[in-house]
């Protein structure tokens, strides 16, 4: 009897264990797919998701190719799941206009994963709601034409170092990866303009600032951890934020200490002794802390060329005092954002321009004539002179940004339930603006894979459908630093082409292979020859 009782107990225990295991597996299976019915309920086409990770494998080749494939297979309104999070992708101009401009109050915030480094979370890129409005409004004065004119000599100094380095390659006549040179150059620009220090990253790669900049640009989440985060976000995101991360903590500590030391030094200096760099402009904005409301923001007009994006905006309202000055963390955040944009976006844009000019010698020849004429009149270019005398350079930059938009996708979050051109959008939905797909849509851009600066003549711009060209976004949350970024690009190409011409070589990759992790860039560099003029 005792043996029978023991057997019954063991059998009962086994049944309970098996039942619990089956229930757990059933629950896990339900969880793995439970988030993946929302797009279908909204009537939005999308790729079939996989358990837990959604459409993560769809993007294994990078977001650029996958975005173009999404548009081709599912149309200008489609969607996907990244982990359990639903993304609605739009590349239809009228829908984009409603989201970015007409219904901006409901789409004023960008998506945040919760895993961004603190320096990024404290930047104007990811600040939210009222605090974003206050900080952006105060920062607008830092990008006025007068302030940019003060920063132009700092960019020119870094450009002189770049030209000196390029002379060595011109003398050798060997093909080389010019993207590496631009990478070093943009670190020099960022150090000087954003962090108030001077470096020569080409000759001093061991400099702590240079090393930390490169570490920041290669910072990423390991793939196994990313899969876990996407599969179980409510558990893994808070856990990942509190777990120790040596690389993240060292980067935060280095840039925080650097900025705090510079601020302390500036506080001891007289006003006329302080460097007129971006950091000083932010500090000046902090002390005055005047802001404008969102209705008066300096908005990048959609569909315009690079030249029009650099013109002084009209003043639409008077500034008012904000209630809360910048914190030191927010100051660090703005400088770090400049680092991200400079090291990636400017480097890649310069690389793409160089590649296109090297492989289109007729366009380069026309641009060289314009450069020589301009430099004959303006041997020491200033911000204002750069805005009027280089129309073909503006066209070349604009067409490059159409073909290779560095920020080829950006997001907005829906604050409340709404409709966009009849499409229901629930609160919390992430809307993704597919700039890459928009810029390569043959309906708006005939022969989109062809480099043709003539698309950006004054006449062509007037005939273009609005909201089909968005390299800097549009509306109140468009790119705040567009004028500074374009200043760096224009001044660099101007100074380099004044001394050299670009030539394609057998090592030049045609067509150029691309990679698209956070921004769009050349996958294997840009190999060319450079010839002294």
Curated annotation (Swiss-Prot):
Pfam families xrefs: p450
Cytoplasmic-facing ranges: 1-10, 97-223, 357-533
Any one of the GO CC terms: endoplasmic reticulum membrane
Transmembrane residue ranges: 11-31, 76-96, 224-244, 336-356
Entry binding sites for heme: 479
Lumenal-side positions: 32-75, 245-335
Signal sequence bounds: none
Family indicated by similarity: Belongs to the cytochrome P450 family.
Entries under PANTHER family matching the protein: CYTOCHROME P450, CYTOCHROME P450 FAMILY 3
Protein name: Thromboxane-A synthase
């Amino acid at each position: 009897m005792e043996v029978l009782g023991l057997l019954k107990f063991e059998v009962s225990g086994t049944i309970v264990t098996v039942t619990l295991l089956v229930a757990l597996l059933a629950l896990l299976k339900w969880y793995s797919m439970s988030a993946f019915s929302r797009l279908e309920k909204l009537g939005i086409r999308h790729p079939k998701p996989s358990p837990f990770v959604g459409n993560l494998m769809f993007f294994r080749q990078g977001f650029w190719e996958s975005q173009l494939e999404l548009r081709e297979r599912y149309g200008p309104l489609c969607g996907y799941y990244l982990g359990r999070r639903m993304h609605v992708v739009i590349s239809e101009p009228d829908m984009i206009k409603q989201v970015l401009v007409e219904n901006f109050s409901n789409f004023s915030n960008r998506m945040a994963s919760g895993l961004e480094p603190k320096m990024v979370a404290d930047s104007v890129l990811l600040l939210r709601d009222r605090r974003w409005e206050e900080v952006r409004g105060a920062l607008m004065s830092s990008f006025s034409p007068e302030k940019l004119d003060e920063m132009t000599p700092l960019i020119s100094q870094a450009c002189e170092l770049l030209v000196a380095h390029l002379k060595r390659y011109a003398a050798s006549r060997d093909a080389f990866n010019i993207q590496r040179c631009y990478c070093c150059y943009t670190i020099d620009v960022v150090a000087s303009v954003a962090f108030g220090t001077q470096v020569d990253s080409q000759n001093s790669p061991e400099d702590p600032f240079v090393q930390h900049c490169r570490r920041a640009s290669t910072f990423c989440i390991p793939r196994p951890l990313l899969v876990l985060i996407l599969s179980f976000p409510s558990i893994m995101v808070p856990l990942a934020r509190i777990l120790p991360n040596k690389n993240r903590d060292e980067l935060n500590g280095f840039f925080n200490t650097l900025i705090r030391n510079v601020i302390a030094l500036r506080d001891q200096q007289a006003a006329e002794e302080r460097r007129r760099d971006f950091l000083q402009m932010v500090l000046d904005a902090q002390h005055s802390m005047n802001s404008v409301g969102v209705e008066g923001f300096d908005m990048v007009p959609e569909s315009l060329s690079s030249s029009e994006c650099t013109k002084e905006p009209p003043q639409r309202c008077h500034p008012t005092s904000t209630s809360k000055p910048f914190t030191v963390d927010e100051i660090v955040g703005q400088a770090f954002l400049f680092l991200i944009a400079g090291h990636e976006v400017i480097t890649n844009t310069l690389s793409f321009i160089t590649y296109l000019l090297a492989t289109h010698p007729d366009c380069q020849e026309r641009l060289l004539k314009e450069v020589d004429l301009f430099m004959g009149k303006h041997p020491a270019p200033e911000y204002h002179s750069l805005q009027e005398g280089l129309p073909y350079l503006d066209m070349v930059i604009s067409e490059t940004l159409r073909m290779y938009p560095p920020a080829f996708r950006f997001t907005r979050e829906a604050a409340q339930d709404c409709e966009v051109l009849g499409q229901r959008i629930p609160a919390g939905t992430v809307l993704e603006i597919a700039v890459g797909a928009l810029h390569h849509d043959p309906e708006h851009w005939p022969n989109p894979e062809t480099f043709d600066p003539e698309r950006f003549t004054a006449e062509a711009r007037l005939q273009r459908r609005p909201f089909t060209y968005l390299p800097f976004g549009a509306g109140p949350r468009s790119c705040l630093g567009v004028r500074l970024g374009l200043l760096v690009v224009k001044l660099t190409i101007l100074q380099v082409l004044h001394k050299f011409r670009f030539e394609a070589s057998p090592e030049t990759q045609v067509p150029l292979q691309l990679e698209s992790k956070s921004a769009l860039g050349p996958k294997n560099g840009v190999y060319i020859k450079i010839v002294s003029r």
